[in-house]
């Protein structure tokens, strides 16, 4: 009788231990999936996007430099050669010290 109680207690303890190990592994898999999703956020090609954005600019070097800075901070460049800033609110919100729009 004493052996069966000890066997039952050790079996119960083993099951609880296995449950804890499984829950820890599930948490690790979930956190790894979240961190992989954060790293899978791809950087855009700022050079190509800014070249397209600044192709009609009268000062293309200045435009490309400003656009590149904005793209590096926001990881987006609005489509087209001007306007369309609603597609990239971060790009539209950056300003100079004089409160002028920084991004072309």
From Swiss-Prot:
InterPro entries, A to Z: GASA
Superkingdom per UniProt: Eukaryota
Entry GO CC: extracellular region
Disulfide linkage: none
Propeptide: 24-38
Tissues where the protein occurs: Expressed in tubers, stems, flowers, shoot apex and leaves, but not in roots or stolons.
Annotated family: Belongs to the GASA family.
Name of the protein this chain belongs to: Snakin-2
Protein species of origin: Solanum tuberosum
Gene name of the record: SN2
């Amino acid at each position: 009788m004493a052996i069966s109680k000890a066997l039952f207690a050790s079996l119960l303890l083993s099951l609880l231990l296995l449950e804890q190990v499984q829950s820890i592994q599930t948490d690790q898999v979930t956190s790894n999936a979240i961190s992989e999703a954060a790293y899978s956020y791809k950087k855009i090609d700022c050079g190509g996007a800014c070249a397209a954005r600044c192709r009609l600019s009268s000062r293309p070097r200045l435009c490309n430099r400003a656009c590149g800075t904005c793209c590096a901070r926001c990881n987006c460049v609005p489509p087209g050669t001007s306007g369309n800033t609603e597609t990239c609110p971060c790009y539209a919100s950056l300003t100079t010290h004089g409160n002028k729009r920084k991004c072309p």
